[in-house]
């Protein structure tokens, strides 16, 4: 687990901050946050006051007039239309929005979403041939198709096609009847940040404007869901759409979204972009990863409450399955990393037989969070490995793969994430090649993650009022990230692990008027480095904690470090004392790591500090006295081993490192 981070605090521009304070009447902290985001007065007005009336004319998108005419003609002639979508949340929501809209116009419309494992992303010829055979007159793609020149070319004389997409456009644009993509050449649409569902929504707007002369503003909650999930910049139109969509989600949401919110346990919360990204979107994504994405579309298009509830429950269960798959693969991957020793110093490359390919990307992201190295997770099936890559800041993983392309069967992606396939017997060779590449291209400093901090806050200035003022910048997302603050000196009043698996940490900080709660997700390691009375610096985001009618500020920890660390010193006598304590704490049977650590801190000898006492567990593991394992329910446990005979402390690397 990474403990240290590079703290990078944004510099101040007091002149610009004062201009924003004067012209826009914002709080000084809000002004600083806006300057950090390069927002001037004019942009600030649009940022803070932008509304649905500021949405751009959909006909400014190239080929929109052609697309509208073709859709209208197809509907008037009662010819069948198929929406060809994608299995991620952007594709699911784009399919749902366009389907619901075309149904409203009376269209004969259905949808087709490829199966993730067998068909993969985007258009495939076999599926289009099937649609032609079934008599489809018009295919409208959403969130895909811009790179499918050859496939479109093969069918364009037999079926009409409209491409709507938001991905980077290649030089060779498919020769469909219409191509709507704000990133293609000669498209003068001002906003280049729309998601796939955003582009589909603009098609709906254009059709509705032509039919009624009015803006189409239905289903904005679905559009917001896909926009946030696809991690596009939340500025310009995206910010307006998401802001309005969240308002709808919190007042009169789509039936399927309401049921999804209920099963996720968020029905008493005000839904934010964070809830979409971390709670709702994963449940929709799980369908495409584990089963089939059509179930997620069915949830969003149904008007039957019983059906919506049943599908929401099903997706919730599918998400649990996804989490279990992910947890199991993650644990196997961690064991693989540990067994590799120094081979994993520069790059993480792990592989396993029949690891579910739908979750290896998530596992790769978790391993980056844990070890902060470029990471490749590979699922092997029938001798072929399918890999997913995630990178670290400043390192182009696509270029790294390209340097090894002679080892790979195929690869693709971009700087931050990529995918590839490889013969399983060449994985070790790939690891060696990437290790050499990383040695040359990654500095020691780049292996230390950066926590970017917007501003320092004195601990006594943190209250609910500052949270309310900062909330003017919501919704948060890419290009408008959740503000991160720092307290550079605070004393820990208490620290404890929480959650069923004791894998989250709660730190209580002292203030002049009371205390502040701070939460660190997935950081049980803090219990071994931070103790009651420790003086720390903390980087955090802010949120409200509502409990029994009381509202208080809560710090969500991004990074926390003691200003001075206790030194670790081990002695033969000290370990003898700790052996007695640990043996009594174990009571001859398995115990949770947390319970044993609590007992150690409660009973340790006065001449041993906390870190030294807890480090004794590492010595006992190395000597085989205790063994760490994960229980069936995912909890870290210790097992006591009855060992006969004398043990030699010099066989413990930890003892040799810290002995005095």
Please identify what each model-predicted range represents.
Residues 142-194:
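Histidine/acidic-residue-rich, glycine-tolerant segments that coordinate divalent metal ions
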Residues 2-3, 10-138, 158, 208-429, ...:
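Hydrophobic helix-and-loop "lid/oligomerization" segment in the mid-to-C-terminal part
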Residues 166-167, 182, 356, 414, ...:
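Histidine-centered active-site/metal-ligand motif
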Residues 73, 168-181, 339, 509-514:
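Acidic-glycine-rich active-site phosphate/pyrophosphate-binding loop
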Residues 98, 103, 239-334, 369, ...:
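Acidic, two-metal ion nucleic-acid-processing modules in DNA metabolism proteins
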Residues 87-91, 144, 166-167, 182, ...:
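Generic detector of well-ordered alpha-helical packing
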Residues 174-228:
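Short alpha-helices
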Residues 131, 154-155, 620:
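Generic structural signal for hydrophobic
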């Amino acid at each position: 687990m990474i403990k240290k981070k590079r703290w990078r605090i944004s510099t101040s521009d007091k002149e610009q901050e004062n201009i924003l304070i004067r012209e826009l009447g914002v709080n000084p902290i809000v002004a600083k946050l806006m300057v950090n985001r390069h927002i001037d007065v004019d942009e600030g007005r649009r940022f803070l006051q932008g509304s649905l009336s500021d949405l751009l004319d959909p006909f400014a998108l190239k080929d929109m007039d052609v697309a509208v005419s073709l859709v209208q003609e197809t509907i008037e002639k009662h010819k069948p239309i198929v929406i060809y979508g994608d299995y991620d949340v952007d594709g699911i929501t784009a399919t749902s929005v366009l389907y619901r809209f075309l149904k409203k116009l009376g269209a004969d419309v259905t949808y087709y979403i490829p199966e993730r494992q067998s068909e993969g992303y985007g258009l495939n010829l076999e599926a289009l041939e099937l649609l032609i055979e079934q008599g489809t007159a018009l295919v409208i793609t959403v969130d895909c198709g811009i790179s499918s020149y050859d496939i479109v070319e093969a069918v364009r004389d037999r079926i009409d096609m409209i491409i709507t997409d938001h991905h980077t456009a290649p030089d060779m644009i498919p020769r469909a009847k219409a191509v709507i993509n704000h990133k293609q050449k000669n498209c003068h649409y001002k906003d280049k940040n729309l998601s796939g569902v955003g582009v589909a929504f603009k098609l709906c707007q254009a059709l509705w404007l032509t039919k009624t002369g009015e803006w189409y503003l239905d289903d904005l909650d679905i559009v917001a869901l896909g926009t946030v999930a696809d991690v596009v910049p939340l500025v310009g139109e995206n910010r307006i759409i998401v802001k309005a969509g969240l308002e709808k989600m919190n007042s009169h949401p789509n039936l399927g979204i309401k049921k999804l919110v209920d099963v996720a346990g968020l029905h008493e919360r005000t839904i934010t972009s964070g809830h979409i990204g971390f709670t709702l979107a994963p449940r929709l994504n799980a369908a495409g990863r584990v089963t089939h994405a059509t179930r997620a579309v069915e949830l969003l298009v149904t008007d039957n409450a019983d059906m919506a509830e049943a599908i929401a429950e099903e997706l919730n269960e599918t998400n649990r399955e996804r989490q279990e798959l992910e947890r199991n693969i993650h644990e196997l991957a961690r064991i693989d990393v540990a067994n590799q020793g120094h081979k994993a110093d520069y790059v993480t490359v792990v592989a396993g037989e029949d690891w579910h390919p739908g979750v290896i990307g998530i596992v790769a992201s978790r391993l980056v969070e844990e070890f902060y190295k470029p990471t490749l997770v590979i699922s092997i099936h029938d001798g072929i490995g399918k890999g997913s890559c995630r990178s670290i800041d400043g390192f182009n993983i696509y270029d790294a793969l390209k340097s090894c392309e002679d080892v790979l069967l195929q690869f693709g992606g971009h700087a931050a994430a990529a995918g590839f396939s490889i013969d399983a017997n060449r994985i070790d060779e790939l690891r060696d090649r990437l290790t050499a590449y990383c040695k040359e291209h990654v500095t020691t400093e780049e292996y230390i993650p950066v926590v970017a901090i917007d501003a320092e806050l004195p601990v006594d200035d943190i209250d609910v009022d500052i949270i309310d003022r900062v909330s003017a910048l919501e919704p948060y997302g890419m290009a408008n990230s959740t503000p991160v603050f720092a307290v550079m000196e605070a004393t820990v009043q208490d620290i404890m692990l929480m959650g069923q698996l004791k894998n989250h940490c709660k730190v209580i900080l002292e203030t002049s008027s009371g205390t502040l709660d701070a939460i660190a997700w997935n950081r049980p390691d803090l219990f071994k480095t931070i103790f009651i009375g420790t003086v720390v610096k903390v980087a955090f985001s802010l949120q409200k904690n509502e409990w029994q009618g009381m509202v208080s500020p809560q710090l969500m920890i991004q990074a926390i470090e003691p200003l001075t660390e206790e030194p670790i010193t081990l002695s033969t006598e000290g370990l003898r004392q700790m052996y007695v304590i640990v043996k009594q704490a174990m009571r001859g049977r398995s115990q949770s790591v947390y319970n044993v650590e609590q007992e150690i801190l409660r009973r340790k000898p006065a001449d041993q500090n906390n870190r030294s006492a807890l480090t004794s567990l590492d010595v006992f593991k190395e000597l085989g006295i205790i063994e760490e394992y994960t229980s069936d329910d995912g909890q870290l446990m210790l097992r006591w081993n009855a060992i006969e005979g004398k043990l030699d402390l010099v066989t413990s690397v930890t003892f040799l490192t810290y002995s005095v």
